[in-house]
């Protein structure tokens, strides 16, 4: 092929998009990477650093993927990553934190496997490739494309366990790709934003998540705090907890980040009762801004592995510049 053609790196990591029923009849397993359909005039190189169902993906795999993308960046114009949907949003956010915004990186997957008549893999893969190669995508950092919608890695989340349009996230998509007789049309509804890049060398620190509920008295807190270098609590509403948690948080020097178990909205420390967000922040808790608990965990993990102090961590979360 002529060297002047656009160069796309297609990275396969497993997931439903690569799955088929196993020969032993025990369910779906990642098998064959999907083919990229209908993309002409593009040089495509394929890579497969691992082939895993996404519940098996760890931050170490995410870092491995980030390193591979950095290696490919000099010889390619864009990167597409196929990934299982269960942890796709976490990998997307990790890449968002750790990769510079310049190289377009798009993640996608499927909710149906290759032997179903409603397989959504080829369409999502083609959409992702066309979005990645679109000039307007440069400078936006890693994105998620699913069902024609384009999502920011910071806000995208899986909102349905089985529906084909499984991804959403407040305040919604930042763009859309549609196919017309004139070719694919990519439209963005938001402009790129400057952001820092975090580049941890290792991921040796440990961060755990606890989930708040009515009547929680801190069960599991002490053990998690002993094992981990930091905690994220999926708190109630705008960042509130039962009163029993207030003295526990006040007693630790380790970072405790408050996200919300609610599906959208920021942490707002406005309540002054025992366990209200204002009292928790006064006791040392760190509001997670608009990040959900599993993304707050990744940001905290990255910051801890960079040697950030608790006040440095508070500053990053509070300013919301990530």
Curated annotation (Swiss-Prot):
Substrate binds at residues 54, 85-86. Residues 13-37 are annotated as: Disordered. It catalyses: L-asparagine + H2O = L-aspartate + NH4(+). The keyword Hydrolase applies. GO terms for cellular component: cytoplasm. SUPFAM superfamilies: Glutaminase/Asparaginase. GO terms for molecular function: asparaginase activity. It is found in: Cytoplasm. The keyword Cell membrane does not apply. Its main location: cytoplasm. The active site is at residue 16. PANTHER family: 60 KDA LYSOPHOSPHOLIPASE, L-ASPARAGINASE. This is Probable L-asparaginase. The gene is ansA.
